[in-house]
């Protein structure tokens, strides 16, 4: 039986991976009068007088919505909101299991950016944070930007930033192994969608100087006029030498390859053209840009993928639960670059110097100490950067 057949049976058995449970008992009239009428009027009055009291008298402080329109689901593409629901339920389960965050799925039957934004803004009073999920680019950039402008709670598109944080954490540790500094590297990012864009921007924030971003047509550079304004932006902040050509051209003399693109597009010959002790994060799923054994045979030093059956899995579950735990605990108004970098360091530091080796640069997903470390680091960064409100 395949994992897909087994999962179908699993989902049929449980008929949903989430349920709502009461935190209080209602066993007599006194309980009823406290939990509901007439007693409930008093916290209502308190919140009406001071809206921040909602964090004291309701579950707002620990509640996150996992919101999707179903337009970019896993490797399935645009399958619509209803078909995306199992993924959003699963994401909500991970929030609860890994960081005790109460998350619930909301799938929206619209692809219109402004309709999505308006809908989320209208339900935001219930929420302490918003996790955007599986929304196609470039709409995901617009939706996140507009929501951040209108809301004072964390808004986080995990497909962008969760991936970027794990990539940075892996790169921090990989650089210890090859004894290189990020500012000296040539980094090639293949894939200019949501993940590739966020990875590029976070690495630049961390100190990278020479990143070349490729899409299916080749390197983004300043000699090309792009109809996509996000490509234009990337071209203006990357590729300092204004290189042109397709992937096999620009990967020459690169120190790092980061793939969020398509299967089997990196050959052994391309790896051989990279600098010595090359680092490759080939994250296309289920088939990576190059398989680890092939990359190693071609001379690569450190290889990561998106798969759990190879070493060094780039897995967002190491990031998003702890990030939201930390942000919620200090009532952060946003998740900023300082918090993302702090999370990346916390994840990287969860691998000790004694454990660190080319096949172990990223901790295992079920090491729950990682989430605690991430949460603490994010809280501290939120306080230092001025976005914590308690």
Which residues does each PLM region occupy?
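Rossmann-like adenosine-cofactor binding region
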Residues: 232-301, 308-309
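General beta-strand structural signal in soluble alpha/beta enzymes
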Residues: 105, 131-134, 155-158, 189, ...
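Glycine-rich phosphate/diphosphate-binding loop of Rossmann-like nucleotide-binding domains
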Residues: 74, 81-99, 157, 161, ...
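N-terminal ligand-binding/catalytic initiation module
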Residues: 1-155, 381, 385-389
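Adenosine-phosphate binding glycine-rich loop
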Residues: 158, 282-390
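Solvent-exposed alpha-helices and their adjacent loops that cap or buttress functional pockets
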Residues: 12, 55-60, 96-97, 122-124, ...
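Short, acidic/small-residue loops that bind anionic groups at enzyme active sites
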Residues: 150-164, 280-285
